[in-house]
């Protein structure tokens, strides 16, 4: 979702409709759904594309809380990564601080204020390295 760039449905309307219908059905059925992107495919940026994925999951029927879990605790559990996915002592502590409340409005995940990687705050200019 870049300013001035048409949404994906403009280019692939039938493909997107089918994918949205499939995800909607899986959500209703209670299937285990994780976030995922096509990065590093052309036009798909690391990080930013996860925010778009969260927005699509909410548009397809997940609550914001379910979508956030799909990107964190559910994904960690699915890949047997017991040191991440939750905020509690002993965990890896890769964290985002955002302005707003993404459990109510998933768009607030884009309002990043600060980032911690393995418990250490990352300075903004080095975050892309």
Where in the sequence are the language-model features?
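C-terminal cap of metal-dependent C-N hydrolases
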Residues: 71-73, 89-129
